[in-house]
């Protein structure tokens, strides 16, 4: 099956196609077994052609951005991992709006908006990864969330391209519901006009906060658990006595207890075992059930 699929991909997809690609190369945790295929479509039309092939052949697939907020199990992913890395359009529109491709890095977007005097997404400067990944999880910080600034998102599926206004989206805290077979390829944002110097000051403040509280020094996926309503996950983990707790090469950060870090040689199984230990300890100590913010895929 893989050889037949490979032949079709090579014949009909213009982007880069890698076989048996270790996902540890494409995730910020630096763990994860091989994907059968790792495909980076050349543009949105190429993405549509790829999705048509996968639908026709019944091939499982997974869309990724910058590989943050993602854990692939050690057995890898049986199917196709799709990267949006080449969806990098970035343009200012009339009316303090900007249209942004899913593959644009969050830091690049905040720098562009600052230079254009457009405010409202400064908090993204401290969130690693891409705009597509940020949209898919409704990323946020410092009281802001990315979908609050969206006018519409552009998605692609087997039926083609679709624009969805924010009022039609089902979203919430670290959550956006997408339809099966649907991938975000871009979004239009509505922003505020402001002096670039004031925007820079806010960006600097966000970066300073991140450096002081989240500069953990080892590969990580950012916050591993969601904050329960009215509570901070890091505090619950701290109170359970787990600062510095370790399973194999995976460790609860000494700097920020909601960050699990790869101290070297970690496996996905190490992170999963450590996460299970944390959930059990927090439940026992506080009665609170933690839920992973990191998305987990793949085979054991």
Swiss-Prot record:
Domain FAD-binding PCMH-type: 30-194
One annotated Gene Ontology cellular component of this protein: cytosol
Catalytic activity: UDP-N-acetyl-alpha-D-muramate + NADP(+) = UDP-N-acetyl-3-O-(1-carboxyvinyl)-alpha-D-glucosamine + NADPH + H(+)
Keyword Transferase: no
Enzyme class per UniProt: oxidoreductase
Top-level taxonomic group: Bacteria
Keywords associated with the record: Cell cycle, Cell division, Cell shape, Cell wall biogenesis/degradation, Cytoplasm, FAD, Flavoprotein, NADP, Oxidoreductase, Peptidoglycan synthesis
Cofactors that this protein relies on: FAD
Pfam families (UniProt xref): FAD_binding_4, MurB_C
Function as written in the Swiss-Prot or TrEMBL entry: Cell wall formation.
Name under which the protein is recorded: UDP-N-acetylenolpyruvoylglucosamine reductase
Originating organism: Geobacter sulfurreducens (strain ATCC 51573 / DSM 12127 / PCA)
Gene name for this UniProt entry: murB
